[in-house]
């Protein structure tokens, strides 16, 4: 995977860990509370043939985000620049840490 991070393409990205609560019947509810952390990073479509082979048609609903190192985890919610919904439209599905950058694969929520 190529780690190309171009400053001129940086955009504001917000991320927030979900809050999980368990009901009396054992059901788990996911909510998004708190203030999302903000970072500037590069968002790209998934282009590698390996990623497209792994994810198939899902790859059309996925993006690659390259951000400064931070506290990112699979399942965290993501808002891209200009998205102002209460719940995040994107979820982190993979995290790869590099020397000074982190690569996130995000998928649009159904």
Sequence positions of predicted segments:
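Active-site-proximal polar cores
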Residues: 1-29
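Short, conserved turn/kink motifs that form compact alpha/beta structural patches or helix kinks used as
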Residues: 27-110
């Amino acid at each position: 995977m190529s780690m190309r991070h171009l400053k001129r393409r940086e955009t504001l990205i917000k991320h927030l860990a979900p809050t999980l609560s368990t009901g009396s019947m054992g059901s788990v509810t996911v909510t998004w509370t708190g203030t999302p952390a903000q970072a500037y990073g590069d968002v790209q479509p998934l282009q590698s043939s390996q990623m497209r082979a792994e994810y198939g048609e899902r790859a059309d609903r996925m993006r690659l985000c390259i951000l400064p190192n931070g506290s990112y985890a699979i399942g965290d919610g993501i808002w891209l620049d200009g998205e102002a919904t209460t719940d995040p439209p994107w979820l982190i599905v993979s995290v790869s840490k590099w020397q000074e950058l982190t690569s996130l694969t995000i998928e649009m929520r159904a």
